[in-house]
């Protein structure tokens, strides 16, 4: 919810797919040209504590404003590009138009039955973001700076697994999720998942379970029952 840059599937019939397990530092193997990170990362464990730091700087595609003039020399962009296609003159002009700097870290305590942690990520852009916002998109990210912080937990007790996360963006938008998975019988498993993603939550690196591709403006409860006829 607070930070995710890898592949993740949305809501599906798989009741165990409601939980995203953190993968730590992994090489990016997708073909997306904008959502990956390029930089350095380090992870250190000491007893029950785990520390992770990362930093990234790269160019991303963005739509340049044709009439943009800035006294300080900064560019002005009207939107971010994510298609990765550069088949027209306009696409080529928008390629690598904006510099993105991202850095952050996580500290967590891991025990045999539980994990709790704090995570933060700071995103900076070297241009002026000036999106044309409509009433339905008035809460979208429209700045060159965003600071997201979050806390997460995971607790296992016998056949029950409780997990959740709460996150806050720089504009005070809040998003949270909480879930339960339980094995009641070798053939019967149940799950429950509550999500409340605020309409003003702003995070370009979120990929939580939900109806939409962005973890914003959603509230609901998802329940599941898995019954195996044969084993």
What are the roles of these predicted feature ranges?
Residues 1-231:
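Outer-membrane beta-barrel channel domains
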